[in-house]
Amino acid sequence: MTTFHSLTVAKVESETRDAVTITFAVPQPLQEAYRFRPGQHLTLKASFDGEELRRCYSICRSYLPGEISVAVKAIEGGRFSRYAREHIRQGMTLEVMVPQGHFGYQPQAERQGRYLAIAAGSGITPMLAIIATTLQTEPESQFTLIYGNRTSQSMMFRQALADLKDKYPQRLQLLCIFSQETLDSDLLHGRIDGEKLQSLGASLINFRLYDEAFICGPAAMMDDAETALKALGMPDKTIHLERFNTPGTRVKRSVNVQSDGQKVTVRQDGRDREIVLNADDESILDAALRQGADLPYACKGGVCATCKCKVLRGKVAMETNYSLEPDELAAGYVLSCQALPLTSDVVVDFDAKGMA
């Protein structure tokens, strides 16, 4: 279901020179709908220069039941991030989808775990919520954060992380690595990559001791970190990645199908609708939107999983997938923004969100 609500901006706070935190006021009747699992994101919708824009931003905190916050960092050519910095102000309203995504972790009070987070740049946004909630909810658990930035001045949530370290001095290990700032220790200088993690593993951290690892940041860093953690002994199933979409980047077509004129049945809100694809490379989502369907989506790059649906009948191929887990694929879930029909009897269900 596409569920947007108009939320009022309670405050806009500067985090760094190019990043702001936007806090929305959530009225009491909607607070249950906006209850989130740490690591999930919000999809924001706004009109900019006559065009509707949608972007996903990780929930970074929610100190009160009536508030929820996301952080927006400016990126080169990013229209929504520019809109956020130049136009979003306290008191205005914005269309905000209910929390989505399955990255992260739901803390459990009785659990005693050791967790690792590796982040670079704005990749810290989902980690802040995960770390803060876990340390608060699981009094016997420990967290290590490896956080990479260019300099200390470009570091998002610097004060919030310092406050967490002061609050949990024995349970939070914070390692800040800077690529453009000279430090006494070479170990904390440079970029987070496979070599850096190998060095940390040889002298400071035993990666095999962690129960779960969470990674978020630039694609190259994430790929290096995932490979390094596996080489250092962490099982695949304990490593979780959250990829941010890069606006303007188009994935090269890897699926060659003939779908021009193909009909697909789309089920949403309990109703079936027949759509027709008008090009071999048109996704099910694009075809449905072109024909007036109001389906959930955000990145259109196979990253955020907002457009996830379930194939009830027929066969579908996906061009790329950065967000669905193997068990979701086995259960028949696909990303409609990447889905191309392979047969003439395809039925997809957007109401089936049971594994979200």
Swiss-Prot record:
Free-text cofactor note: Binds 1 [2Fe-2S] cluster.
Single GO molecular function: flavin adenine dinucleotide binding
Pathway: Aromatic compound metabolism; phenylacetate degradation
Bilayer-crossing regions: none
Pfam family, one: FAD_binding_6
Domain 2Fe-2S ferredoxin-type: 262-354
E.C. no: 1.-.-.-
Chain segments carrying region Oxidoreductase: 112-228
Record's note on what induces expression: Activated by cAMP receptor protein (CRP), integration host factor (IHF) and by phenylacetyl-coenzyme A (PA-CoA) that prevents PaaX from binding its target sequences. Inhibited by PaaX.
FAD-binding FR-type domain residues: 2-106
Domain of life: Bacteria
Cofactors that this protein relies on: [2Fe-2S] cluster; FAD
Cellular component terms per the entry's GO annotation: cytosol; phenylacetyl-CoA 1,2-epoxidase complex
The UniProt record lists the keyword Cytoplasm: no
A biological process term (GO) from this entry: phenylacetate catabolic process
Keyword annotations from UniProtKB, A to Z: 2Fe-2S, Electron transport, FAD, Flavoprotein, Iron, Iron-sulfur, Metal-binding, NAD, Oxidoreductase, Transport
Residues holding [2Fe-2S] cluster: C299, C304, C307, C337
Gene3D superfamilies in the cross-refs: 3.10.20.30, Nucleotide-binding domain of ferredoxin-NADP reductase (FNR) module (3.40.50.80), Translation factors (2.40.30.10)
Role of this protein: Component of 1,2-phenylacetyl-CoA epoxidase multicomponent enzyme system which catalyzes the reduction of phenylacetyl-CoA (PA-CoA) to form 1,2-epoxyphenylacetyl-CoA. The subunit E is a reductase with a preference for NADPH and FAD, capable of reducing cytochrome c.
Family: In the N-terminal section; belongs to the FAD-binding oxidoreductase type 6 family.
Protein name: 1,2-phenylacetyl-CoA epoxidase, subunit E
Lineage of the organism: Bacteria, Pseudomonadati, Pseudomonadota, Gammaproteobacteria, Enterobacterales
Gene: paaE
